[in-house]
Amino acid sequence: MGKLVVQGGAVLEGEVEISGSKNAALPIMAAAILCDEEVILKNVPRLQDVFVMIDILRSIGFRVEFEENELKIKRENDISQEVPYELVRKMRASFNVLGPIAVRTGRAKVALPGGCSIGVRPVDFHLEGLKKMGFSIKVEHGFVEACFERRIDYVTITLPFPSVGATEHLMTTAALLKGARVVIENAAMEPEIVDLQNFINRMGGHIEGAGTSRIVIEGVEKMQGVEYSIIPDRIEAGTYLVAIAASRGKGLVKNVNPDHLTNFFEKLEETGAKLKVLGNEVEIEMRERPKAVDVTTNPYPGFPTDLQPQMMAYLSTASGVSVITENVFKTRFLHVDELKRMGADIEVSGNVAIVKGVEKLSGAPVEGTDLRATAALLIAGIIADGVTEISNVEHIFRGYEDVIDKFSELGAKIEYVEKEN
């Protein structure tokens, strides 16, 4: 495990190309389990989480080839009903293979998931939904076993919270429940869910309503092979836009769907940043100290929780006091103590952080606690005086393709240093 050494003071300028969305690619890869024929996915980011999902698919009987950003998936052997613990523990999204395996084979056994440590993310919504769809569920010794027990004609599943993972898991599983009509109420509305619906429908599924709070799935008997391109990563796009603004630079962020970031754009403009949308490109310029703004995270289409840490790093040098309210992951403030080590003035009470802008941050040794927190510390290091060393940095490679090269091309001075034995 290495560290990132960041020389502060760079002004980011130039162009950056956004990769395909990790959060769209992973559930789409899980949905490929529904199909025996070859599935070709384009614009897939080369990230650690994607490689973990590839290993999972291979472990259960699929042939997977990954060249450049194109992924080919095809069932080669009988589908295994159990996924090795050492794979599932690495990544939360791996849990979403439980339903697809169970609906294909009648049974699945998967370990409780791992991934980012940003608070409790219970899988109860997934399991209660699967029960309503005719599966028996047994949780024992850290494993979940799902067995298909009874056919259903019609069921409505109302999620207590619009969970992205549960929405994706349940709609994917329901897609192959032949003859069943499954309605998900209070569904998550993220663009990645729309992408998943579009992919499954291209394979022959019958799903409508993704992007709204009510999704209706008509189960079919069989899926067919398809070629499909993953949407751009809106969180990666937002991260680079914040970084350019924080450094008081100017840049062009390419391969973006601006409709996916409306709320975020509004907040950036409130801080004084100048944005210009040019088709699937966004130009940003920020030459002055940002104005403080209040940010409240909410499920889509609200301000994304996955951009809250980066926004906090940006606002740490704003003029005035910003109030950041975290409504999605209540404990998503692990980056606060690290930013404070760099001179940020932040106080947390419950799910609210009060950010009093300071003139400058100072380089310091800090530790990445999760994927987006590490991105926030990288931004803080770029705008700080002096050198920042970020340890436990492997998180960032789970969510940002070619992150060092992309930031370096914008003018950041970043080096990855292997840990000495």
From Swiss-Prot:
CDD domains: UdpNAET. Keywords: Cell cycle, Cell division, Cell shape, Cell wall biogenesis/degradation, Cytoplasm, Peptidoglycan synthesis, Pyruvate, Transferase. It is found in: Cytoplasm. InterPro entries: Enolpyruvate_Tfrase_dom (IPR001986), Enolpyruvate_Tfrase_sf (IPR036968), MurA_subfamily (IPR050068), RNA3'P_cycl/enolpyr_Trfase_a/b (IPR013792), UDP_GlcNAc_COvinyl_MurA (IPR005750). Gene3D superfamilies: Enolpyruvate transferase domain. GO terms for cellular component: cytoplasm. The active site is at C116. Phosphoenolpyruvate binds at K22, N23. Its EC number is 2.5.1.7. It catalyses: phosphoenolpyruvate + UDP-N-acetyl-alpha-D-glucosamine = UDP-N-acetyl-3-O-(1-carboxyvinyl)-alpha-D-glucosamine + phosphate. UDP-N-acetyl-alpha-D-glucosamine binds at R92, D306, V328. Pathway: Cell wall biogenesis; peptidoglycan biosynthesis. Pfam families: EPSP_synthase. GO terms for molecular function: UDP-N-acetylglucosamine 1-carboxyvinyltransferase activity. The modification 2-(S-cysteinyl)pyruvic acid O-phosphothioketal is found at C116. One of its GO terms (biological process) is cell division. Cell wall formation. Adds enolpyruvyl to UDP-N-acetylglucosamine. HAMAP family: MurA (MF_00111). Belongs to the EPSP synthase family. MurA subfamily. This is UDP-N-acetylglucosamine 1-carboxyvinyltransferase. It comes from Thermotoga maritima (strain ATCC 43589 / DSM 3109 / JCM 10099 / NBRC 100826 / MSB8).
